[in-house]
Amino acid sequence: MNCRFSVRLLLLVAIAIPARGEDIRQLARSVDDHYNHLRSLQADFTEIYRGEGAERVESGTLWLKKPRKMRWEYRSPKEKLFISDGQAVWFYLPAERQLRKTTLKKLDDLRSPLAFLLGKTKLENELQGLSKVVDQSPLSPENTLLRGVPQAMVGQANEVQLEITPSDQIVRIVLLEADGATTEYRFAGWKENLELSDSRFQFTPPPGVETVEGQLGP
């Protein structure tokens, strides 16, 4: 290889590597800024679980509100309800007439990180080794796919992937779990800064429903 060409190539590589890192940091800061300035969110979601040779697809509507309030209404293939008022968490299965209850601090659930989208988010702190995914494609070609190791989910998830739109919205979250399974959340129809009553994030069980204190089910 020509010596002069080699030197130019090395210089280009040296310049490009930090530039890519800076691009990722800038994107992370833009996403942080977007979500840190929101009060509330609503979206349709699809949850896809793959593990042990099986696939489970569920869908419904999600609401998020500061601070750390969330409500997941599953409608398909069966109804269930997952609610947090910022402190307590309820998981209700109407078909089984059973309510499971715990606290947000004790929650061991893959849905919990989404509550912090409306906290003081800083992706570079929450996802160690944040980098661009180059061996996979985003669902939409104009989006960017990032990956990192989740600091708050040690022992649960080995990696989190975020698909981000040009307008800094997170439209897909993929969690690669420690046991080899994957849980994927896809979001559509985002509505931001809605007026959401706190009552939407409260739950009173119907009469005759069994309440179980402790960890929640799937």
Feature locations, PLM:
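Sec-dependent signal peptide recognition
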Residues: 4-12
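N-terminal leader/targeting segments and the immediate start of mature chains
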Residues: 17-56, 69, 205-218
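Extracytoplasmic
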Residues: 38-40, 57-59, 65-67, 77, ...
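A generic structural motif
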Residues: 46-50, 73-75, 92-94, 149-151, ...
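An acidic-aromatic
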Residues: 61-113, 183-184
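Flexible, surface-exposed loop/linker segments and immediately adjacent secondary-structure boundaries
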Residues: 97-142
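Gly/Pro-enriched, hydrophobic low-complexity segments
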Residues: 125-208, 212-215
